[in-house]
Amino acid sequence: RVNESGPDNMLHRTESYWRLWARKEPIDLSPLSAGVGELFYRSQLVLRTQIDNGGAIIAANDSDITQFGGDHYSYCWTRDGALVAYALTLCGQSELSRNYFRYCAECVEPDGYFLHKYTPTGDLASSWHPWMLDGLKILPIQQDETSLVLWALRKHFTTFRDVEFIKPLFNSLI
């Protein structure tokens, strides 16, 4: 397609798409300077680069640390994802926040909590939280990992009032 239409046309179409995407909801930015308003739109694009199409909100798309034998940050921490989902809700990006909550519904443990972090596909990721402490089995969780997802979901619901979206999540996530 690039050979047919030319790279300039493809770049223009791509820029037009993402410009429209970031501005699809009417948000009053009149109190802000033009430069700050542009930063608002650009920040949505930056957020989008960290969101997997399957709904996972990734901490960072890095991989260079793995060449030194370390772990990376291309994981979803549900706490961090919840805060980003709330920011997306405030920006009117309901589809991305919906996808995140669907992703969370697939990851939540049967007893209703989230573990430390997950891969973009929803599998349990490596963790530094112990499963045993002083010879006793413990859950390797942090309470805000679960509570912030529910808080962000509530903010999403009160903003968009999308009952049909929330209904299938009720039993699994809420």
Name the predicted role of every residue range:
Residues 79-80:
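Hydrophobic alpha-helical transmembrane segments
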Residues 56-66, 76, 92-174:
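Helix-terminus loop motifs that line ligand-binding clefts
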Residues 1-73, 94, 98, 105-111, ...:
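Acidic/polar, glycine-enriched structural segments that form the non-catalytic walls/loops
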